[in-house]
Amino acid sequence: MHHFSSRSAVMEAVVGYLHVRRLNEYRQLMSDIDSPDQMLTRAAIRTSVETAWKYVNLPSFIAYQELLGAARTDPALASAVDEVERDFEREFLKTVRAVFPHWKQVKSLKAAHELVQFVMQGMGVAHRSPQREQRARRVIDTVTDYLETIYLADTAS
């Protein structure tokens, strides 16, 4: 800690580091799923949902969730997290548009993104749930169904 002026400076550095790392990990994981020169298939949609599940099981995601929990009772940490959360949300949605070209013009893109994000985050923090992987597969199937429905409804001509 001797490299930092205070505990809050350490926490701000950790939050900032995880912010950049999480965005980069997401970009790397999702970058080759949706090819703009091919038709979007259910398999590609499912792969994106499965990859989102992998993402919320990465050590960086888990560490960040711990910080979010701690920020509930630590005002200085909450301040650092709030700032990063706003930026993360903007950057995350930009990344979604960049790595999923078929979804760029989908009217319900934000709703689809939020569905995946909140469901996967919820499953991610339920790491002690019995039969976690079997339950995750069922939820992945359901989320894939919804995303396919949203995509087909919003792109039907």
Model regions and ranges:
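Hydrophobic recognition helices of helix-based DNA-binding modules
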Residues: V14, L18, R22, Y26, ...
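Hydrophobic/aromatic-rich alpha-helical bundle segments in the mid-to-C-terminal region
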Residues: A78, D82, V99-S157
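A short structural micro-motif
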Residues: V10, D87-E91, V119
